[in-house]
Amino acid sequence: MSNNLTGIFNNPQGNNTFDMKIFFSVGEPSGDLHGSNLIREMLHRDNNIECVGFGGSLMEEAGCTLLFDLTQFAVMWFVNVLLNLHRFIGFARQAERYFKENSIDAVVLIDYPGFNWVIAKKAKRHGIPVFYYGVPQLWAWAPWRIRKMRKRVDYALCKLPFEEKWYRDRGCEARFVGHPFFDEMENQKQTIDQDFLTRQRETPGKLVTLLPGSRQQEVEGQLKWFLKAVTTVQRKVSDTRFAIASFNQTQADYASKLVAASGLNIEIYVGRTPELMQAAHCCLACSGSVSLELMYHHTPTVILYHVNRFRYFLGNHLIRSRYITLVNLIASANPFLRTKEVWHPNLPGGEDIPMPEYPT
């Protein structure tokens, strides 16, 4: 992926010099990770590139000058966006001032579509080429937004294999560059704490690792349902133990409070997600890119994502993809076929689907 992707950014405006300034806009923890790896690869190829913009601590460590750590506002759903709207307006104005006062060679957007649509519009207003790395999943819902993509984005860099054709068929300059998670899995092999991994594997009991998400809002909405599942499993399968893989200390502190109130015996770790995935007998994970990581490790997994009735009703009418889980979307011969599949929990998946999906 890295060689394929970084070559795209070589002199996007046709400049005769390799000195470049690239503005990044990243607002989610996973995007922070992908952005940091992209920045490292770019600086490895040319250390005269200057990276600046919105991102997180990982991008900063990789060499990006942050105007603000936007990952702390990784919000979801319309109401939560409205509550933080004044902040996003301020960040967008800050970006536009920066575009006016500096010579920017390219803008790189990673995920975070609501805010990044605005950044793309402001960048195009100043004649700056815009690259969208990890394009919005317009094929899944609200496909009419493709007009924004055509108008505001110069290059759509796709992480999923079926996305390139979908975007090209709708008039976008698109290229499949591969999913960064698989590069990151290879890199993780060098940083795995083997002693911790060995201790987990040698501890008696079947380890079930809980992965309730990387966004704070996600953890707060999902973890209590994970703990209900733990209660059920403990009651039915005595030879089990549980661990929560927290993205940061704030989420670990939140998890500690819920676990203490529940009376359950669950260990909580920060920064041990790869080890806990590999050591697990199975995992309970929040829906998202983590399913690809678990597929890479061949770890049996149940994907859980709880929404209230209104959100379920809304999603049921807006979502246009056949499946929710990324593993299923990649495996399916036709991820866009709009049919209602129903599986019984005790039956294996049908046709080409490794993870049967059903509402509970």
Name each region found by the language model.
Residues 3-360:
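Nucleotide-activated sugar donor-binding and catalytic core shared by glycosyltransferases
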